[in-house]
């Protein structure tokens, strides 16, 4: 597993690379509240079949913490991905997107379908962002853009985030996001 930083005109992206250099190219896009680290286990299992890259999206992991224009849906992330694959010289590849990464992958497919050999989505959100949308033009389910995400939030976790209760936050991350024996320091 190799971690490199790739600088494009848009930003510097931290990216994990693994697999066969001559294998089919597979780009793995992580979800919200995660990073490319989440794909290390999968990359190890697929190392004999694919040439893989797993970038940290902007504001995540070790990539530049640049602002995101929410009015563009997933397009800031998708544009970053396009610059990255151009810098890597990838002409054709399979894109895999999980959660928010699925929305990024769909936006990439809308804008650059000619670059894709395939797309795999795992529990994706809309390419139009976090508000509830429908249809190919991203029409809002209701005028304020409500209808996804926060309605399912854990009230205790929100209170811990507001009060700075790092021990509770670490326990949530340990139980949901990471595998033993790894633990988040309180």
For each feature predicted by the language model, list its residue ranges:
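N-terminal cap/lid segment of alpha/beta-hydrolase-fold proteins
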Residues: 1-12
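Conserved HGGG/HGGXW glycine-rich cap/lid loop of the alpha/beta-hydrolase fold
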Residues: 11-70, 84
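Structural signature of beta-strand start/N-cap positions in the alpha/beta core
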Residues: 25, 49-51, 91-94, 115-118
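Glycine-rich His-Gly loop
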Residues: 28-31, 99, 124
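Active-site loop/oxyanion-hole signature of alpha/beta-hydrolase fold enzymes
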Residues: 44, 53-100, 110-111, 126, ...
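Short glycine-enriched nucleophile-adjacent loop
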Residues: 102-113, 119
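A short, hydrophobic beta-strand element of the alpha/beta-hydrolase
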Residues: 120-122, 127
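Alpha/beta-hydrolase
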Residues: 140, 148-186
């Amino acid at each position: 597993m190799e971690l490199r930083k790739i600088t494009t005109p848009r930003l510097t992206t931290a990216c994990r690379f693994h697999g066969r250099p001559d294998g089919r190219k597979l780009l793995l896009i992580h979800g919200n509240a995660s990073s490319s680290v989440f794909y290390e286990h999968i990359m190890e299992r697929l190392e004999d079949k694919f040439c893989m890259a797993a970038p940290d999206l902007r504001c995540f992991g070790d990539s530049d913490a640049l602002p995101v224009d929410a009015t563009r849906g997933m397009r800031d992330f998708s544009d970053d991905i396009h610059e990255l694959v151009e810098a890597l010289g990838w002409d054709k590849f399979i894109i895999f997107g999980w959660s928010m990464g699925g929305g990024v992958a769909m936006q990439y497919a809308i804008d650059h379908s000619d670059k894709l050999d395939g797309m795999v989505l795992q529990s994706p959100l809309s390419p139009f962002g976090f508000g509830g949308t429908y249809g190919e033009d991203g029409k809002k389910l209701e005028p304020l853009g409500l209808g996804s995400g926060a309605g399912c939030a854990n009230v205790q976790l929100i209170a811990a985030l507001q009060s700075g209760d790092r021990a509770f936050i670490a326990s949530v991350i340990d139980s949901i996001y990471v595998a033993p024996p790894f633990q988040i320091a309180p």
